[in-house]
């Protein structure tokens, strides 16, 4: 438990630093570049994330939960598969660039996407000792690597933006960040390096575990990027850029929670399965109450201050991001409540149930976004994201009960408190939010 708390705190400090640097970069770049540049980069990011998730074999979770997760042969095989995947992703990006530029009616995508996709090729060479450090909850060096990488990317982005005043600044700085991350991982994280080899048994284990992760991440792409994929098609680039800034500010607590839980819950579940004893379940309940409470306070604080934050931090071109922050943060309350349950399945190696939950989320999110946007434009799409997460709660219960992790007391307490507080924040900012209704 002590290691888990220490790892959680280090992860939170690292993530706060990382997001703080991102915010600083965002603030500087919005004053150098134009809203359309952020809209274009958001589109590029959607496609890169899509390619990454469409080919995810779950190497990180596999290393964290496998009994062979510390064996050199297993780690080298995982690294080798990761390299092959990175090369395939870059090739796919090159092939898709021109067709996507036609679909989204943005000719520049044909040039930006292949160059940006070099980041996928580079990250394929990241050593597995990064995941080994996460497996053993040694978050100190991991945090240093993440912060150092972000600092390099920030400096590169600002310098290039000042020099070029174009989207190329964001594209090239992404490549610089990937190279820096690779170097920092090799230099700063202790442990042996990897060599290229494909052990048959390790390959079979990784593929067996990863086949459901692969399907889950297809769904995960829709869950995490579906709003941008749909809104990127129907909104103008400048409007889409403003939405993306609102999303960045609103999603800080959710992204923080997801990172902490991914790095801490899987090891804790592996060492103390909740269905093994009442003591283990109560220990997990305590962790869950603390985590959800902290994240919900952060989320609703962001919602309460969203309009003011945008007014203070950004120039008038981005003011509509304020009500986006408020609405989106309020709609993320259901996600915060159930955030720990899906990782419980991965901790048990049950990637099949994890896929079923991911598929349910993807279907609910897609249908809700399409219906919401059709009925209420951007406002409807924002509300839809909260509705989708409430709709799939029965599937969450099914998964959590199978792992002995479902805690109805926790869910009831935070759903009641979250609903009352989010409704109050919504009512307080209704005059601003109403401007989103089309």
Give the label of every model feature segment.
Residues 4, 140, 167-168, 183-224, ...:
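Interhelical loop/hinge segments that connect adjacent transmembrane helices in multipass membrane
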Residues 7-22, 149, 153, 170-181, ...:
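Transmembrane helical elements of multi-pass membrane transporters/channels
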Residues 5, 65-71, 122-145, 168, ...:
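Membrane-interface junctions at transmembrane-helix termini in multi-pass inner-membrane proteins
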Residues 110-117, 144-191, 208-209, 247, ...:
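Hydrophobic alpha-helical transmembrane segments
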Residues 1-23, 72-80, 109, 140-144, ...:
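N-terminal membrane topogenesis motif
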């Amino acid at each position: 438990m002590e290691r888990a708390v220490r790892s959680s705190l280090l992860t939170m400090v690292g993530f706060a630093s990382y997001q703080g640097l991102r915010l600083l970069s965002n603030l500087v770049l919005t004053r150098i570049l134009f809203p359309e540049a952020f809209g274009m980069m958001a589109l590029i990011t959607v496609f890169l994330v899509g390619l990454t998730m469409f080919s995810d074999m779950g190497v990180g979770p596999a290393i964290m939960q496998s009994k062979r997760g510390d064996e050199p042969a297993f780690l080298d095989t995982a690294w080798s598969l990761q390299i092959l995947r990175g090369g395939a992703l870059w090739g796919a990006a090159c092939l898709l660039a021109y067709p996507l530029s036609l679909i989204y009616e943005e000719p520049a995508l044909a040039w930006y996407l292949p160059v940006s996709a070099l980041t996928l090729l580079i990250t394929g060479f990241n050593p597995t000792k990064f995941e080994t450090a996460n497996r053993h909850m040694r978050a100190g060096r991991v945090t240093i690597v993440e912060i150092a990488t972000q600092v390099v990317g920030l400096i590169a982005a600002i310098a290039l933006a000042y020099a070029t005043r174009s989207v190329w600044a964001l594209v090239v700085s992404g490549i610089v960040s990937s190279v820096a991350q690779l170097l920092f991982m090799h230099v700063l994280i202790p442990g042996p390096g990897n060599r290229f080899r494909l052990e048959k048994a390790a390959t079979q284990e990784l593929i067996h575990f990863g086949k459901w992760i692969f399907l889950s991440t297809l769904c995960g792409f829709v869950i995490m990027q579906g709003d941008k994929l749909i809104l990127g098609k129907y909104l103008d680039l400048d409007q889409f850029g403003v939405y993306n800034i609102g999303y960045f500010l609103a999603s800080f607590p959710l992204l923080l929670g997801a990172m902490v839980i991914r790095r801490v819950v899987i090891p804790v579940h592996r060492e103390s399965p909740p269905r093994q004893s009442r003591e283990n379940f109560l220990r997990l309940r305590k962790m869950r109450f603390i985590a959800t409470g902290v994240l919900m306070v952060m989320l609703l604080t962001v919602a309460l201050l969203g309009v003011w934050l945008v007014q203070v931090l950004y120039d008038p071109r981005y003011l509509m991001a304020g009500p986006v922050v408020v609405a989106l943060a309020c709609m993320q309350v259901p996600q915060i409540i159930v955030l720990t349950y899906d990782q419980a399945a991965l901790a048990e190696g049950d990637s099949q149930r994890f896929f079923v939950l991911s598929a349910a989320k993807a279907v609910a999110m897609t249908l809700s976004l399409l219906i919401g946007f059709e009925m209420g434009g951007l406002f409807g799409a924002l509300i839809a994201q909260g509705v989708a997460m409430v709709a799939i709660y029965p599937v969450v219960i099914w998964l959590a009960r199978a792992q002995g992790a479902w805690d109805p007391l926790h869910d009831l307490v935070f759903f009641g408190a979250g609903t009352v507080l989010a409704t109050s924040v919504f009512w307080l900012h209704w005059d601003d939010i109403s401007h989103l209704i089309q």
